[in-house]
Protein backbone atom coordinates (compact mmCIF):
# COMPACT_ATOMS: atom_id res chain seq x y z
CA UNK A 1 0.00 0.00 0.00
CA UNK A 2 2.84 2.42 0.66
CA UNK A 3 4.65 4.14 -2.18
CA UNK A 4 7.58 4.87 0.07
CA UNK A 5 9.50 8.13 0.34
CA UNK A 6 9.72 10.23 -2.81
CA UNK A 7 13.08 11.35 -4.13
CA UNK A 8 12.30 14.99 -3.40
CA UNK A 9 11.31 14.52 0.22
CA UNK A 10 11.18 11.82 2.86
CA UNK A 11 7.43 11.99 3.57
CA UNK A 12 5.54 8.75 3.24
CA UNK A 13 2.32 8.84 1.29
CA UNK A 14 -0.47 6.34 0.84
CA UNK A 15 -1.67 5.43 -2.65
CA UNK A 16 -5.18 6.74 -2.08
CA UNK A 17 -7.02 9.26 0.04
CA UNK A 18 -10.32 8.63 1.79
CA UNK A 19 -13.16 11.08 2.22
CA UNK A 20 -13.39 12.70 5.64
CA UNK A 21 -17.20 13.08 5.53
CA UNK A 22 -16.87 16.85 5.23
CA UNK A 23 -16.04 16.90 1.51
CA UNK A 24 -12.28 17.18 1.90
CA UNK A 25 -9.75 14.46 1.05
CA UNK A 26 -7.53 13.26 3.86
CA UNK A 27 -3.84 13.70 3.11
CA UNK A 28 -1.59 11.18 4.79
CA UNK A 29 2.04 12.25 5.11
CA UNK A 30 3.48 9.72 7.52
CA UNK A 31 3.62 6.03 8.20
CA UNK A 32 1.04 4.54 10.58
CA UNK A 33 2.30 4.06 14.11
CA UNK A 34 1.21 2.10 17.15
CA UNK A 35 1.77 5.23 19.28
CA UNK A 36 -1.48 7.12 19.90
CA UNK A 37 -1.15 10.33 17.90
CA UNK A 38 -3.62 12.99 16.78
CA UNK A 39 -3.47 15.43 13.89
CA UNK A 40 -4.60 19.01 14.47
CA UNK A 41 -7.52 18.40 12.12
CA UNK A 42 -8.61 15.35 14.11
CA UNK A 43 -8.45 17.36 17.34
CA UNK A 44 -10.72 20.00 15.78
CA UNK A 45 -13.16 17.32 14.62
CA UNK A 46 -13.28 15.76 18.10
CA UNK A 47 -13.81 19.13 19.81
CA UNK A 48 -16.65 20.04 17.45
CA UNK A 49 -18.32 16.64 17.87
CA UNK A 50 -17.99 16.77 21.66
CA UNK A 51 -19.44 20.29 21.77
CA UNK A 52 -22.43 19.56 19.54
CA UNK A 53 -23.15 16.22 21.24
CA UNK A 54 -22.95 17.84 24.68
CA UNK A 55 -25.54 20.44 23.66
CA UNK A 56 -27.72 17.74 22.08
CA UNK A 57 -27.52 15.50 25.16
CA UNK A 58 -28.28 18.46 27.43
CA UNK A 59 -31.43 19.26 25.48
CA UNK A 60 -32.48 15.60 25.33
CA UNK A 61 -31.97 15.16 29.09
CA UNK A 62 -34.06 18.31 29.64
CA UNK A 63 -36.91 16.89 27.50
CA UNK A 64 -36.28 19.41 24.72
CA UNK A 65 -35.82 23.11 24.23
CA UNK A 66 -39.12 24.34 25.71
CA UNK A 67 -38.41 23.14 29.29
CA UNK A 68 -34.95 24.76 29.07
CA UNK A 69 -36.48 28.04 27.92
CA UNK A 70 -39.05 27.93 30.74
CA UNK A 71 -36.51 26.96 33.42
CA UNK A 72 -32.90 27.81 32.37
CA UNK A 73 -31.56 26.55 35.72
CA UNK A 74 -32.08 23.01 34.37
CA UNK A 75 -28.84 23.56 32.48
CA UNK A 76 -26.88 23.67 35.75
CA UNK A 77 -27.65 20.00 36.39
CA UNK A 78 -28.10 18.64 32.87
CA UNK A 79 -25.02 20.16 31.20
CA UNK A 80 -22.43 18.45 33.45
CA UNK A 81 -24.31 15.13 33.12
CA UNK A 82 -24.41 15.48 29.34
CA UNK A 83 -20.71 16.33 29.17
CA UNK A 84 -19.83 13.29 31.31
CA UNK A 85 -22.01 11.07 29.09
CA UNK A 86 -20.36 12.34 25.91
CA UNK A 87 -16.84 11.99 27.30
CA UNK A 88 -17.39 8.42 28.49
CA UNK A 89 -19.90 7.09 25.98
CA UNK A 90 -18.68 8.79 22.80
CA UNK A 91 -15.05 9.83 23.22
CA UNK A 92 -13.81 6.66 24.91
CA UNK A 93 -15.69 4.58 22.32
CA UNK A 94 -13.99 6.34 19.39
CA UNK A 95 -10.57 6.37 21.08
CA UNK A 96 -10.84 2.61 21.62
CA UNK A 97 -11.31 2.08 17.87
CA UNK A 98 -8.37 4.38 17.14
CA UNK A 99 -6.08 2.79 19.72
CA UNK A 100 -6.75 -0.74 18.50
CA UNK A 101 -6.26 0.21 14.84
CA UNK A 102 -2.97 1.90 15.67
CA UNK A 103 -1.87 -1.18 17.61
CA UNK A 104 -2.14 -3.07 14.31
CA UNK A 105 -0.02 -0.41 12.59
CA UNK A 106 -2.91 1.24 10.76
CA UNK A 107 -3.49 4.90 10.16
CA UNK A 108 -6.60 5.83 12.14
CA UNK A 109 -8.26 9.21 12.64
CA UNK A 110 -11.69 10.35 13.78
CA UNK A 111 -13.80 12.24 11.26
CA UNK A 112 -17.00 13.98 12.23
CA UNK A 113 -20.18 13.75 10.19
CA UNK A 114 -21.81 17.19 9.97
CA UNK A 115 -25.16 15.81 8.86
CA UNK A 116 -25.24 13.31 11.72
CA UNK A 117 -24.23 15.92 14.29
CA UNK A 118 -26.75 18.50 13.13
CA UNK A 119 -29.49 15.86 12.90
CA UNK A 120 -28.76 14.91 16.53
CA UNK A 121 -28.95 18.56 17.56
CA UNK A 122 -32.20 19.07 15.67
CA UNK A 123 -33.84 15.98 17.20
CA UNK A 124 -32.72 16.92 20.71
CA UNK A 125 -34.75 20.14 20.45
CA UNK A 126 -37.82 17.87 20.59
CA UNK A 127 -36.52 15.90 23.57
CA UNK A 128 -35.10 12.78 21.98
CA UNK A 129 -31.76 11.90 20.49
CA UNK A 130 -30.53 9.88 17.55
CA UNK A 131 -26.85 10.49 16.92
CA UNK A 132 -24.43 9.48 14.19
CA UNK A 133 -21.60 11.88 15.04
CA UNK A 134 -18.81 10.37 12.95
CA UNK A 135 -16.39 7.49 12.85
CA UNK A 136 -12.74 6.54 13.08
CA UNK A 137 -11.38 6.11 9.56
CA UNK A 138 -8.91 3.23 9.37
CA UNK A 139 -6.47 2.47 6.57
CA UNK A 140 -3.91 -0.29 6.49
CA UNK A 141 -3.23 -3.86 5.48
CA UNK A 142 -5.09 -5.93 8.09
CA UNK A 143 -6.95 -9.22 8.16
CA UNK A 144 -10.72 -9.59 8.47
CA UNK A 145 -10.17 -10.79 12.04
CA UNK A 146 -8.18 -7.67 12.94
CA UNK A 147 -10.80 -5.48 11.27
CA UNK A 148 -13.49 -7.20 13.35
CA UNK A 149 -11.52 -6.63 16.54
CA UNK A 150 -11.10 -2.93 15.69
CA UNK A 151 -14.85 -2.67 15.08
CA UNK A 152 -15.77 -4.56 18.28
CA UNK A 153 -13.51 -2.73 20.72
CA UNK A 154 -15.64 0.47 20.70
CA UNK A 155 -18.91 -1.21 21.78
CA UNK A 156 -16.97 -3.40 24.23
CA UNK A 157 -15.62 -0.21 25.81
CA UNK A 158 -19.20 1.06 26.24
CA UNK A 159 -20.24 -2.25 27.81
CA UNK A 160 -17.29 -2.10 30.22
CA UNK A 161 -18.23 1.47 31.20
CA UNK A 162 -21.86 0.40 31.76
CA UNK A 163 -20.73 -2.43 34.04
CA UNK A 164 -18.59 -0.08 36.13
Question: Where are each of the predicted segments found?
Answer:
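Hydrophobic transmembrane alpha-helices and their immediate loop junctions
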Residues: 1-164
